[in-house]
Amino acid sequence: MTKIGIIGAMDEEVELLKSKLSNCSERTIAECEFYTGTIEGKEIVLLKSGIGKVNAAIGTTLLIQLFQPTAIINTGSAGGLDSSLHVGDLAISTEVRYNDVDATVFGYEFGQVPQMPAFYQPDDMLIDIAIEAAKTVGIPSKKGLILSGDSFMSDAALVEQLKRRFNYPLCSEMEAGAIAQVCHRFGVPFVIIRSLSDIAGAEAKVSYDEFLETASVNSANLVLAIVGRLG
């Protein structure tokens, strides 16, 4: 039976998904909250990991080791970097990179953790399913690069630097890189789904405060559509 791991960082990002779980049971380990149950007959392990890369890595490792999911979907909000995307729109990962790692003095690419890949490749089948599912939720979507780092992108100069440094990033957020790296190490297929709560830059916090719930619901609705298409 397919067992799908779904990861969100905050209450807002898992609330809708938790409400859809049948026969839900809860377990907390190292402050990571796990909710197990079913959605549309599929076995689900929903994790609220906490915010940031280390929390995400801890939670993802526990999820894989304790529950052995066949695939992992990461859901949540992000700050937009692509001018064609608007608040509430959806981003589907085709690659994931860190935006706050610099070992270039040793010949690595910017964003590349030493001895690790320069970027992390989501599962092709999950990407295709996400793209098809996005057509049914009535929200504009785009596939591409998602950046990840332990900073909220409210510095306009830093945002412009990231846009110059990376090729056409869709958005930036704070957990996906760690989740992708852990999935890579364990060989678990994954895809990252984000909805924009803000446009990264000086006004990002104001938008984030207003639209976090909208972004969280939009991302969760796409995850539900993906779950419905998984075998």
UniProtKB/Swiss-Prot annotation:
GO terms for cellular component: cytosol. One of its GO terms (molecular function) is adenosylhomocysteine nucleosidase activity. Belongs to the PNP/UDP phosphorylase family. MtnN subfamily. Catalyzes the irreversible cleavage of the glycosidic bond in both 5'-methylthioadenosine (MTA) and S-adenosylhomocysteine (SAH/AdoHcy) to adenine and the corresponding thioribose, 5'-methylthioribose and S-ribosylhomocysteine, respectively. Also cleaves 5'-deoxyadenosine, a toxic by-product of radical S-adenosylmethionine (SAM) enzymes, into 5-deoxyribose and adenine. GO terms for biological process: L-methionine salvage from methylthioadenosine; L-methionine salvage from S-adenosylmethionine; nucleoside catabolic process. This is 5'-methylthioadenosine/S-adenosylhomocysteine nucleosidase. Substrate binds at residues 79, 153, 174-175. The active site is at residues 13, 198. Its EC number is 3.2.2.9. The gene is mtnN. InterPro entries: MTA_SAH_Nsdase, Nucleoside_phosphorylase_d, Nucleoside_phosphorylase_sf. Keywords: Amino-acid biosynthesis, Hydrolase, Methionine biosynthesis. Pfam families: PNP_UDP_1 (PF01048).
